[in-house]
Curated annotation (Swiss-Prot):
Residues 1-229 are annotated as: Pyrophosphorylase. The gene is glmU. UDP-N-acetyl-alpha-D-glucosamine binds at residues 8-11, 22, 72, 77-78, 139, 154, 169, 227, 332, 350, 365, 376. Homotrimer. GO terms for biological process: cell morphogenesis; cell wall organization; lipid A biosynthetic process; peptidoglycan biosynthetic process; regulation of cell shape; UDP-N-acetylglucosamine biosynthetic process. This is Bifunctional protein GlmU. The active site is at residue 362. Catalyzes the last two sequential reactions in the de novo biosynthetic pathway for UDP-N-acetylglucosamine (UDP-GlcNAc). The C-terminal domain catalyzes the transfer of acetyl group from acetyl coenzyme A to glucosamine-1-phosphate (GlcN-1-P) to produce N-acetylglucosamine-1-phosphate (GlcNAc-1-P), which is converted into UDP-GlcNAc by the transfer of uridine 5-monophosphate (from uridine 5-triphosphate), a reaction catalyzed by the N-terminal domain. Residues 251-460 are annotated as: N-acetyltransferase. It catalyses: alpha-D-glucosamine 1-phosphate + acetyl-CoA = N-acetyl-alpha-D-glucosamine 1-phosphate + CoA + H(+); N-acetyl-alpha-D-glucosamine 1-phosphate + UTP + H(+) = UDP-N-acetyl-alpha-D-glucosamine + diphosphate. Mg(2+) binds at residues 102, 227. Acetyl-CoA binds at residues 379, 385-386, 404, 422, 439. It is found in: Cytoplasm.
């Protein structure tokens, strides 16, 4: 039998106090909506419908091409939101999962278990529930003396007895698709919120003698709905612990997993060592037996095996195996450091390719450059690549030696085995096997310093 899914993503999220729609706030690198969509994908729905409303086009962009969409122009409650999906799902045979787009911690495994429970028990509706130590703010699951679910009562509508119930509604359900839309035609807004409650269909099913069940989550944390920044931080904390635990199980060493921040799509090979206060974001990949020391920050980059990154930032770049970077280096976007490269302290590389075994030990800027293998950069070298309007390229061939405090003014080519003298400003191409000296000759004026105020002879 086919499965379908409705993701509710139309709300503004007023308590977030943000111009961004609530479901587009990120947890561990991707939006809450994407987390939910990935979990839903585990049940392999024949059709997925996302209900959008507030800033609909922004929300649509996130799942464009992956989901059907329907508009809820007025936010009149969860029941009303599901009504908007009828055009996409009306008349279809099967089970429909309904889930909120602000529940990023739900897992695909739990949703699959929920679907299986629903089908195996032949329910017309199944509620995903959880047991809360503090149930305030949640809808309560009310059962009869036989343990059967009779209704769901929202916090504002609950009496004193019902408020003591700790089994709560997570806001996720599975329904017989046809019966869901039939029942929705019979709900109304006679409640404290003046909204169409999706939960009212449960009472309708019970009144008709139809079977309603509840599947209890094993992990209460999965039920978290994010309505404000406090809950967003909680979700981030839980997700971080999950991610880091998975990497540790897979053979990665963490000095302090509570102080290491890794996005959900990051890939890390076994035997990598990660010290505290490391951040790995986006689509970053780290090869086996690499070491990332305290303070390293890497975004959307590929780090090869056996590399050592020491307290440095790497963005949108590739670092091949055996390279060392840092401390305090900055590898800016579109750079490639090839095998065995050494980039030392206070070196910045931008939009450049650095060849095998090349070394830039300290205090160097390499921008828009093509650098060969076995090149050595002396301290204080700068590629001058920008004239205020255009960027120009510096090309340095294999085994060149760039003397300390060289200024390389692009466009410029330096040939194989060439050398630039320390302190030179190089403006013309340097042929292979040549030495380039671009500095004025030193002149010593003997006795001249005696006339200066600092000289002892001038002191009274």
């Amino acid at each position: 039998m086919s499965h379908y899914a409705i993701i509710l993503a139309a709300g503004k999220g007023t308590r977030m106090k943000s111009d961004l729609p609530k479901v587009l706030h990120k947890v561990s690198g991707i939006t809450m909506l994407e987390h939910v969509f990935r979990a839903v994908s585990v049940i392999e729905p024949a059709k997925n419908v996302t209900v959008i409303g507030h800033k609909a086009e922004l929300v649509r962009e996130v799942l464009d091409g992956q989901s059907a969409f329907t508009m809820q122009t007025e936010q009149l409650g969860t029941g009303h939101a599901v009504m908007m999906a009828e055009e996409e799902l009306a008349g279809l045979e099967g089970q429909t999962l309904v889930i909120a787009g602000d529940t990023p911690l739900i897992t695909g495994e739990s949703l699959k278990n929920l679907i299986d429970f629903h089908v195996n028990h032949k329910n017309v509706a199944t509620i995903l529930t959880a047991t809360a130590d503090n149930p305030f703010g949640y809808g309560r699951i009310i059962r009869n003396e036989n343990g059967e679910v009779t209704k769901i009562v929202e916090q504002k509508d609950a009496n004193e007895f019902e408020q003591q119930v700790k089994e709560i509604n997570t806001g996720t359900y599975v329904f017989d698709n046809k019966r869901l839309f039939e029942a929705l035609k019979n709900i109304n807004t006679n409640n404290a919120q003046g909204e169409y409650y999706l939960t009212d269909v449960i009472s309708i099913f019970r009144e008709n003698g139809e079977k309603v069940g509840a599947y209890i989550l094993r992990d209460f944390e999965e039920s978290l709905g994010v309505n404000d920044r406090v809950a967003l931080a909680t979700a981030e904390d839980v997700m971080r612990r999950r991610i880091n635990k998975t990497h540790m199980i897979n053979g990665v060493t963490f000095q302090n997993p509570n102080a290491t921040y890794i996005d959900v799509d990051v890939e890390i090979a076994p035997d990598v060592v990660i010290e505290a206060n490391v951040t790995l974001k986006g689509q970053t990949k780290v090869g086996a037996e690499s070491v990332l020391t305290n303070g390293t920050y890497i975004v959307d980059s590929t780090i090869g095996a056996n590399t050592v990154i020491t307290n440095s930032m790497i963005e949108h770049s590739v670092v091949e195996k055996g390279a060392t970077v840092g401390p305090f280096a900055h590898i800016r976007p579109d750079s490639m450091l090839k095998e065995g490269v050494h980039i030392g302290n206070f070196v910045e590389v931008k939009g450049s390719t650095i060849g095998e075994n090349t070394k830039a030990g300290h205090l160097t800027y390499i921008g828009n450059a093509e650098v060969g293998s076995d090149v050595n950069f002396g301290a204080g070298t700068i590629t001058v690549n920008y004239d205020g309007q255009h960027k120009f390229k510096t090309q340095i061939a294999n085994n060149a030696f760039i003397g300390s405090n060289s200024t390389l003014i692009a466009p410029l080519e330096i040939g194989d085995n060439a050398l630039t003298a320390a302190g030179s400003t190089i403006t013309d191409n340097v042929p292979a096997d040549s030495v380039a000296i671009g500095r004025s000759r030193q002149v010593n004026k003997e006795g001249y310093a005696i006339k200066k105020p600092h000289h002892p002879s001038q002191q009274k």
